[in-house]
A protein has these predicted regions:
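Actuator/coupling domain of P-type ATPases
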Residues: 2-28, 69-72, 80-83, 87-91, ...
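Cytosolic catalytic headpieces and adjacent flexible linkers of membrane translocases
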Residues: 221, 225, 363-385, 390-505, ...
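Cytosolic catalytic regions of ATP/NTP-dependent phosphoryl-transfer enzymes
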Residues: 164, 287-414, 420, 433-434, ...
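Membrane-embedded transport module
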Residues: 344, 464-513, 518, 528, ...
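Transmembrane helix-loop-helix hairpins at the membrane interface
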Residues: 19-97, 104, 338
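Hydrophobic alpha-helical transmembrane segments
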Residues: 55, 59-93, 100, 198-290, ...
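Cytosolic catalytic regions of P-type ion-transporting ATPases
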Residues: 62, 93-206, 400-403, 476-485, ...
Length: 771
């Protein structure tokens, strides 16, 4: 078999017939820059800046500097993340042996072309779809595709799907499907429509932005009309008031903060060899209630070892016999365990060998005229494992039991039993304990015997290990499946479709993450809210996942969860500071339209409050440790702070306007009072958010407070306010004192309303259950 010629290979490469799946793990620098520069809010802010320039009031376009700074930071963070991610190889040098022009050569998987002739031997991973041309006892493990652990004999013209592993024998096969057309990648495409890839936090923020965006244009137009045509203001005054109102409604800092915080999390994880392929993955992991995983590669490390021996014939030299039965060529986990224990020797005369096959369930070795059988007892003799009482403890533990026998088929003598166990990862117990402490339920979904998995969990002192079920026993009724899925801990002998159905059932009222590495995991990875692929897994499983553990180290998961919690909890904590401005700007704009009075702020005044009282402190607070479990109450928590404080700002302004109207005072003289009180209320919220105070938070709070008041005192002309005097200080002090009680009152009222709504929702839920 000569394979393809150089000319044939080049022809196929030039015609796009090479094994390139074109999966992009990061965006190009151009895409990163354009996506961060050309945004709805940047365009809107530039348009507003142009309007301000027409008034000649240059100091009122300082809000643009914030937008530029925000954009530069976002681009820098994403480019930094890209550099780190690009330096990590998701697929660790997968290679394949092909025959070209009669020579065997090893090439990277990306250089495989259609019709290539591939040489297969024991231990090889199948990276593309193949058709067998020649088989020498070729056996394939298709468990990553079918979930069945038994090896399948492959003969001429049989198909071997990508994701399979050659367990024994050798052969030649032709490449029939590559890249996106391979079985594994097709499965990814078929499953791609399953999942909504927007996270709770992103969805909530996007919904807020949609509402604001819808309101900005009509409110802005009406505000200008009111200011210019009805209030009798000049063009310049009307434009500045309108721009201030519109800018105030946009929580652009919240969008940037979310993006920067998530990207910083991605960078931190990448340094630990964890690739966050989709930004929302880190947030979803933080909210995870249920984690689904397989036994192999997570709890166990995929290797086995000999735990014990039960020798029936005390006269034999078990170690000598097994050392001569072992061969260097055998590479499956059981063979490696036997070789590690007994070694490989040639001290006895071996006259014949028949390799292990799935059909016979044993290997046969003829040593000095005597046949030795190594494998499953039921396939060697008429006896059963359960006939031997000394094996009962190992059967109950779910150990793999290998039988050594000798003689002719009709006169088999059982010599010994070798007890094999899975090697448990050193970090498994601590990792499982961590998730239990964090209130995350663990579900083991495996293709293995559920009893075996259950006993491994028992050895780790894992609660609920006895709650197991086989895939064939899963109920078909949807409601019953949800109940069983919630109550069961170990799911054994599961097919890919069954994995998907169980995860779908678990998602009914929970956030579910799943760890997988095989083609048979793809549907489950896609169905889960967050798919986590092991670095040693097939490429298709990686591309179907949000997160890739490049070192396949299960113990890094707590770090990912903690990082996600830090990001989400901190964003939730500071988001209300951005939405105060949105709240009072929207209310003030509507009141200005209805009551036809001038808008009380200039853009530069809002820029001062936004940068000193909100932007700077929120940026630092967002990077603090915060590992408490994430609750899905973003809207409730955020608006509990934003609404009372925002409404209080509006009440302050209304009182000042009424005071000026009743006592015939010039409103311009009292802008200082409005700006100072708004800054005070925002700083008061910052103080609330910083609790409990530590040294760092105290420094931050003092710095922001001093900076805000110092700028107003030193640069009143820049911020278009009057200087502090006795009247303004008294006014600010009195209203500031009253504000504290107003905010507390509105917060109590808010809590009562939320409690009523929750009670109403719970009643409806109970009624729906009964129905």
């Amino acid at each position: 078999m000569n394979g393809l010629s150089k000319h044939e290979v080049e022809y196929r490469k030039n015609n796009g017939l090479s094994n390139n799946d074109n999966i992009k793990y990061t965006r190009s620098p151009k895409e990163i820059i354009l996506s961060n520069v050309i945004t709805l809010f940047n365009i809107l802010n530039i348009a507003l800046a142009v309007l301000v320039l027409t008034t000649g009031s240059i100091q009122n376009i300082t809000f643009v500097s914030t937008i530029i700074f925000n954009t530069i930071i976002a681009i820098y963070q994403e480019l930094k993340a890209k550099k780190i991610l690009d330096n990590i190889k998701v697929t660790k040098g997968d290679k394949v042996t092909v025959v070209r022009e009669g020579n065997k050569i090893e090439i990277p998987k990306e250089e495989i072309v259609l019709d290539d002739l591939v040489y297969l031997s024991s231990g090889d991973s199948v990276l593309v779809d193949l058709e067998v041309l020649k088989s020498s006892s070729l056996e394939v493990d298709e468990s990553v595709i079918t979930g069945e652990s038994d090896a399948i004999i492959k003969r001429k013209d049989d198909k071997i799907m990508s994701g399979s592993i050659i367990t024994s024998g050798s052969g030649y096969a032709k490449v029939i499907s590559i890249g996106r057309n391979s079985y594994a990648n097709k499965l990814v495409s078929e499953a791609s429509s399953i999942k909504d890839e927007s996270s709770y936090l992103q969805t909530t923020i996007n919904n807020i932005l949609k509402i604001v965006t819808i309101m900005i244009v009509p409110v802005g137009v009406l505000l200008f009309i009111t200011q210019y045509f009805k209030s009798g203001q000049t063009y310049n005054e009307a434009i500045l008031g309108t721009v201030a109102g519109v800018i105030g409604m946009i929580p652009e800092g919240l969008v940037l903060l979310t993006s920067v915080a998530l990207t910083a999390g991605v960078i931190k994880m990448a340094k630990q060899n964890v690739i966050i392929q989709k930004l929302h993955g880190i947030e979803v992991l933080a909210c995870t209630d249920i984690l689904c995983l397989d036994k192999t590669g997570t709890i166990t490390d995929g290797t086995m070892e000999v735990e014990d021996e039960v020798i029936l014939n005390k006269k034999i030299n078990l170690e000598e016999i097994l050392a001569n039965i072992n061969t260097e060529e055998s590479n499956n986990a059981t063979d490696i365990a036997l070789k590690n224990k007994y070694g490989v020797k040639n001290t006895l005369k071996v006259t014949d060998r028949v390799p292990f096959s799935s059909a016979k369930k044993c290997s046969i070795t003829e040593i000095e005229g005597t046949r030795y059988y190594l494998g499953a007892l039921e396939y060697i003799s008429d006896k059963k494992i359960t006939d031997y009482k000394e094996l009962t403890p190992y059967i109950e533990k779910g150990n793999r039991i290998i039988t050594l026998s000798r003689g002719k088929k009709e006169e088999i003598e059982v010599l010994a039993f070798i007890i094999i166990k899975d090697n448990i990862r050193e970090s498994a117990k601590d990792t499982l304990k961590y998730f239990k402490q964090q209130g995350v339920d663990i579900k083991i979904i495996s293709g293995d015997n559920p009893i075996t998995v259950s006993n491994i969990l028992k050895s780790l002192e894992f609660d609920g290990h006895e709650k197991h079920i086989e895939g064939k026993d899963l109920p078909e009724d949807e409601k019953e499946l949800i109940r069983v899925a919630k109550e069961t801990v170990v799911f054994g002998r599961m097919t890919p479709k069954q994995k998907q159905l169980v995860i779908k059932a678990l998602k009914e009222d929970s956030t579910v993450a799943m760890i997988g590495d095989g083609v048979n995991d793809i549907l489950g990875l896609k169905e889960a809210d967050c798919g986590i692929a092991l670095g040693t897994g097939v490429s298709a499983a990686k591309s179907a996942s949000e997160v890739v553990l490049t070192t396949s180290d299960f113990s890094v998961l707590p770090e990912i969860v903690n990082e996600g919690r830090r990001v989400v909890n901190n964003i939730k904590r500071v988001a209300s500071m951005y939405l105060i401005k949105t709240t009072y700007s929207l209310l003030l704009s509507l009141l200005s339209i209805i009551l036809t009075y001038e808008y009380p702020f200039y853009p530069i005044q809002l820029s001062l409050i936004s940068s000193i009282c909100v932007g700077i402190p929120s940026f630092f607070l967002a990077l603090e440790p915060n590992y408490t479990k994430v609750e899905k109450d973003f809207i409730v928590k955020v608006f509990r702070n934003a609404l009372p404080n925002g409404i209080t700002v509006v009440l302050n302004i209304f009182i000042v306007i009424m005071f000026c109207s009743v006592f015939n005072q010039n409103f311009e003289s009292y802008r200082l009072v409005i700006v100072t009180l708004t800054g005070f209320i925002t700083l008061r919220l910052l103080y609330t958010i910083c609790k409990p105070l530590n040294l760092w938070r105290k420094i931050l709070l003092v710095f922001c407070s001093i900076s805000f008041f110092e700028l107003l005192i030193l640069l009143p002309d820049l911020f278009l306010v009057s200087k502090f005097d006795i009247v303004s200080i008294v006014f600010i002090t009195l209203l500031g004192f009253v504000d504290t009680y107003i905010i507390d009152f509105i917060e109590e009222l808010y809590d009562k309303v939320v409690q009523k709504v929750r009670g109403w929702k719970n009643e409806r839920k109970e009624k729906n259950k009964l129905a």
